[in-house]
């Protein structure tokens, strides 16, 4: 039996209940940072002060899907930190940068994303090496956030990002549902499509003419 092409899986909208924390199981494998291929990856990065040092997970431990889900839950339940991404203008800017870096710069094809109050998830197929992809996204968004929020003298993003290889179609769908269901699990909305800073919400608001976040070709209103 031939291998199903990823292009046939990228934006298939498979119905089903979004996972909550109790039934989420992710089996994730950490990638080498020189990884570059046409196979999707699951990326996560968070604000610098989003977790206190005694609650942050060592990077190596996050190769475990169970540890990653536990960290994500801590981020969703966090009460400390600046929560800069809770501000609509900042969250809008992050979404614009995700679209711009994928659609205009061509660094990746975006399949799912969500901007949470203190972290970001992105499911994408890289067209460039991961260091270039993450450096571009984190660098330009940090620079613009500094200007928007008049921040000085501190980091915006945690230096380390988390990247995991998507190994097959079932995992692809599970991770996409996990990403788009994050605002529901965190209690921010009742339905994934209600959250405007995600691919699910984007499809409802920006994608009314059809297509997907990766093929709409929407350029940010201001240069990124």
Where are these regions (language model features)?
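Short catalytic/metal-binding and nucleic-acid-binding patches
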Residues: 1-224
